[in-house]
Amino acid sequence: MVPFGGWEMPLAYPSGTVAEHRACRNSAVAFDVSHLGTVRVDGGDAFEHLQRSLSNDLTRVHPGRAQYTHLLDEDGFVVDDLIVWWVDDERFDVMPNASNTTDVIEAIGGRDVTEDRAVIAIQGPEARSRLARVSSEAATVHRFAVRSFEWAGATCLVAGTGYTGEEGVECAVPAEVATAFWEAVLGQGVVPAGLGARDTLRLEAGLPLHGHELGPGITPLQAGLGWVIGWDKGPFTGRAALEEERANGPARRLRGFVADGRQPLRDGSLLCEGEEQVGILTSGNFSPMRERGIGLGFVDADARLLDGDAITIVQRGRELPARLVRPPLWPVREESE
């Protein structure tokens, strides 16, 4: 167990991170992601309030859908990246990162219902077929759809979301049935997986992690996430700063990297073109599928490097040859919306 965002979390189960990772790519795994916050925002003004508070445009979706979005500060920097579950006309369940729940509540209001439920993510190409033996209702939810389902006499929620680059769902179940639901899912041959596999999977999928690719000093445009900005809607926090950055172009951009060898890449390593530093690695690890070191990092906009170009990663005094690769760093298989 390791501390993570104020929670004690399993880094891996006995099978180990690499086996858990490959199980997600080839069959199905389950993550207990109950550390993710749930902030409930409801009432007749909830929609308009979130439209003003968050970057994405809620008119792009409707009740029964989920949306990825950002909470920004006035400088356009990412306070947190969130998933909003639009449960019904006047109820939104906002899912912040573990350590940011308090900051999110201060910014958007709502009430913390994190400890009332557990969130179980079932991911992988066989996730739905195995989950169907536990709940056919939960297994048939489409990507980024949200619906309620009944299980063991309790009302639960399921969304077609995840953080792995695979098909799958995330189930929010009341705390009193959480252990039974977890055991029922594992009883269908679903492999339990920990934080280690969750990180290598999201890294292969090219997905950002708050505190690494997102956070203070980083804007959505720098992170290549301009699509989470609702340019066509009205005012929202950080809009003016983002409009200025869009006009001038971001000073740096997030890129993907694949090393020539198996050495795991590490965050904080320098990205160099010849003798010149052109960026910094923000996340790195070993890819169990590529069997190479992989990473994400920011490269200065004036470096003019293209996908496929060679780059040197200076890591703990060693020079590791690598190439720029447009994320994802492994083919994703998420179903279409």
Where do the language-model regions lie?
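Conserved, structured C-terminal
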Residues: 1-5, 9-12, 85-337
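Acidic, proline/glycine-enriched N-terminal capping motif
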Residues: 1-72, 77, 196
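Short amphipathic beta-strand starts and helix->beta connectors
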Residues: 17-26, 71-81, 106, 150-157, ...
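Acidic active-site catalytic centers that drive phospho-/nucleotidyl reactions
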Residues: 32, 81, 170
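Well-ordered mid-protein domain cores that form the structural environment of catalytic cofactors
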Residues: 60-104
